[in-house]
UniProtKB/Swiss-Prot annotation:
Keywords: Cell membrane, Membrane, Transmembrane, Transmembrane helix. The lineage of its organism: Bacteria, Bacillati, Bacillota, Bacilli, Bacillales. It is a multi-pass membrane protein. GO terms for cellular component: plasma membrane. This is Uncharacterized protein YwrE. It comes from Bacillus subtilis (strain 168).
Length: 111
């Protein structure tokens, strides 16, 4: 369990560093810490997934569920941002995050 949180911290650090690099390379303007949903439907999909995540915490291990939650949420964000706001290129941030979380999930599942 402790290894998981250490790996999660490393993944977050790598994600932040890669976001900084992507922001510089592609000139992406990411303003603020709060995420802005593409549409009202997108917002409600994420709220529904968050509610499902909270209810399923008692049935599944937190490590797997947390990683799956981030993978699903970021995958939805990739699609919505790519489909509705491709000129912003913000979906590139989420591609990096999904890749890191997927690698972390594979590592945790093999333990």
């Amino acid at each position: 369990m402790t290894n998981f949180w250490i790996l999660m911290l490393i993944a977050i650090t790598i994600s932040l560093a890669s976001q900084f690099f992507i922001k510089k390379k592609y000139g992406i303007d990411k303003s603020g810490w709060r995420y802005k949903h593409v549409s009202n439907t997108h917002k409600w999909i994420e709220i529904t997934l968050l509610i499902l995540f909270v209810f399923s915490l008692s049935f599944f291990p937190v490590e797997y569920l947390l990683l799956l939650f981030f993978i699903v949420i970021d995958s939805i964000r990739i699609f919505m941002e790519w489909h509705y706001r491709p000129e912003d290129k913000q979906y590139m941030y989420h591609i990096v995050e999904v890749s890191l979380m997927f690698m972390l999930l594979i590592y945790v599942c093999t333990l």
